[in-house]
């Protein structure tokens, strides 16, 4: 809450986060993928069913898009990993109004890359757009096979 009593326009509430392990796994296995020199982004539409054929029960239709961040231990010590998380979350928070809605995004850094705000900020929105297009094209291919 801001001092004026209204909600902050650019926030990152828990409802905007991918938190369950099954949601991460689903996005990593079935989502569209895009990468650049420092980040890998996976995008998966909210309405993709689980293995049992049902959409996730707790996914709200009011959520525009959600972010999950996964930082492998090979990335560095806790200080380095937490810096990556902060920078990726900030890039999402500042650009969430520009991102396609209805998707879960899972982001991870590439190995042996130093966290640089300019690189993350510049590439984040572009990678999300590319991952969404790939996710949609793979969904189109799988629907024609059925």
UniProtKB/Swiss-Prot annotation:
Gene Ontology annotations of biological process type: tRNA 3'-end processing; tRNA 5'-leader removal
UniProt entry keywords in alphabetical sequence: Endonuclease, Hydrolase, Nuclease, RNA-binding, tRNA processing
Recorded catalytic activity of this chain's protein: Endonucleolytic cleavage of RNA, removing 5'-extranucleotides from tRNA precursor
Keyword Nucleotide-binding in annotation: no
GO molecular function: 3'-tRNA processing endoribonuclease activity; ribonuclease P activity; tRNA binding
EC number(s) given by UniProt: 3.1.26.5
A single Gene Ontology CC term: ribonuclease P complex
Subunit text: Consists of a catalytic RNA component (M1 or rnpB) and a protein subunit.
Family listed: Belongs to the RnpA family.
Protein function: RNaseP catalyzes the removal of the 5'-leader sequence from pre-tRNA to produce the mature 5'-terminus. It can also cleave other RNA substrates such as 4.5S RNA. The protein component plays an auxiliary but essential role in vivo by binding to the 5'-leader sequence and broadening the substrate specificity of the ribozyme.
PANTHER family for this protein: RIBONUCLEASE P PROTEIN COMPONENT
Protein name (record): Ribonuclease P protein component
């Amino acid at each position: 809450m801001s001092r004026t009593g209204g909600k902050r326009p650019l926030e990152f509430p828990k409802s905007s986060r991918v938190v369950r392990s099954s949601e991460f796994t689903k996005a990593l296995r079935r989502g569209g993928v895009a990468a650049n020199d420092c980040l890998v982004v996976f995008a998966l539409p909210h309405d993709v069913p689980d293995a049992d054929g049902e959409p996730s029960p707790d996914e709200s239709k009011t959520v525009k898009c959600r972010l999950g961040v996964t930082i492998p231990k090979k990335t560095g010590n806790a200080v380095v990993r937490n810096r990556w998380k902060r920078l990726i979350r900030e890039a999402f928070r500042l650009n969430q109004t520009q991102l396609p809605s209805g998707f879960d995004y899972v982001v991870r850094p590439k190995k042996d890359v130093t966290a640089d705000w300019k690189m993350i900020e510049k590439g984040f929105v572009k990678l999300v757009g590319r991952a969404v297009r790939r996710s949609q094209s793979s969904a189109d291919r799988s629907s024609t096979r059925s």
